């Protein structure tokens, strides 16, 4: 296990997502091993395949289908996601502020 100083964990996570989603890692689905998937992925139980979660700032335009992986797209202006997700929606910043989700 690598111990990172304050602030470096975010950098490491950012690099992981860059490599995983933009360079080509994780382009295809694969069968889950012992029912588990790698970091940044989720188990699609319908197909027993490991699929990409979308990184923060993106949402699932198309969910994985067992052959093709999740297709992520940047969130529209004034919306966001803060965690890797598989949702096909984003949170409206104005609504989040009204609901006290942003402090």
UniProtKB/Swiss-Prot annotation:
Q: Which UniProt keywords apply?
A: Disulfide bond, Late protein, Repeat
Q: Which residue ranges contain the repeat TNFR-Cys? A: 36-73, 74-103
Which Cys pairs does UniProt list as disulfide-bonded? 37-50, 51-64, 54-72
The answer to whether keyword Disulfide bond applies is yes
Record-linked SMART domains: TNFR (SM00208)
Superkingdom of the source species: Viruses
| Transmembrane segments annotated in the record for this chain | none
In the record, the note on similarity to other proteins reads: Belongs to the poxviridae A53R protein family.
Q: What is this protein called in UniProt?
A: Truncated secreted TNF-receptor-like protein A53
Q: Which source organism?
A: Vaccinia virus (strain Copenhagen)
Q: Highest lineage ranks of the organism? A: Viruses, Varidnaviria, Bamfordvirae, Nucleocytoviricota, Pokkesviricetes
């Amino acid at each position: 296990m690598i111990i990172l100083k304050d602030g470096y964990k975010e950098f490491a996570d950012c690099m992981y997502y860059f490599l995983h989603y933009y360079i080509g890692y994780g382009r295809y689905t694969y069968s889950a091993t012992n029912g588990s998937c790698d970091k940044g992925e989720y188990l699609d139980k319908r197909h027993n395949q490991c699929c990409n979660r979308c990184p923060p700032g993106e949402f699932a335009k198309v969910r994985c289908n067992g052959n093709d992986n999740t297709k992520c797209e940047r969130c529209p202006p004034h919306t966001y996601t803060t965690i890797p997700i598989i949702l096909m929606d984003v949170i409206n910043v104005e609504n989040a502020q009204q609901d006290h989700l942003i402090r």
